[in-house]
Amino acid sequence: MYARYLDAMAAVVHFGAPSLFVTMTANPNWKEVQRSLAYDQTPKDRYDIISRVFNAKLKELLKDLEGMLGKQLAKVHVIEFQKRGLPHAHIVVILTEADRARNANHINSLSTAEIPPLPDVNDRSNLANVQRRLRALVLEHMVHNDCSGPEGRNCRCYDANKDGCSGNFPFDFCEETTTGDERQKARYRRRRGASWTATVPCDRRKSATGTRVVTNQWVVPYNAALLLKYTCHLNVEVVTVAYAIKYLFKYLFKGSDNASAAIHQTQRILDQISNYENHRYLGAAESFWRIFKFSPGQLSHTVVRMAVCFPDERCATRTLC
């Protein structure tokens, strides 16, 4: 895993800093999954189908990213499996210098963090129908869960160090997108108003009505064209911060999940070190992914590692200050 991280960093040295960070998560309600289920089955009963459909859609997405958002120089992607079961892909894309986001308008064309306004009721044009469909997809897939209030400590996104959401939700309202600088991330436009407000279902333990009102503060950045095509959670972030490069790639290559297991013996043996072992665990989705021999990740270019040691001798590394 560390060697793959170094390969990715070598691509950055050669081609330049990343331009886009894309995350795609499988949708168990994809029509390809639903029509393959038996009458008494649910998606969680057929992770083999979910893995196959996700792999096919991921290949299509990787092709689209070669030119849909700008001319691509290089990319790297890694497949990860959530503890809740659904596979997702993290993709870092390096675009040409001419296609990199340089201003607010360019960032808005690549990624937005707003709920699409609802067209007029009497407007039945194709554009209005697409707008309605996009709004429904954003509310279904691109709205962050409600992690505010005291109940937020029980949410998956809670960060004890921040005493709040690890993704910094909810964001402040912002009238215009700002590009940021080398130390500050770009801020997406998140306007305030009734046009960008909607009601979505939520956990009844947080609301007696089973609904919550969401604004642009809770929207995960997305690309409209990609969301309409793939109908799943598809986060598209524009990377403008130079110091975030190593963070992105270390996040990609952080490795698989592990679990600590305690071993209890019938006879009393005072060996506390051996009583605890660290094991990898595989969920159903990851197991099928490996059975089908799907790729766990790939770099668009081949990196040749040069040997820096004498033949038949151990390689040595040295940290440069």
Q: Each PLM stretch: what is its role?
A:
Residues 1-321:
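Extended, structured polyanion-binding interfaces
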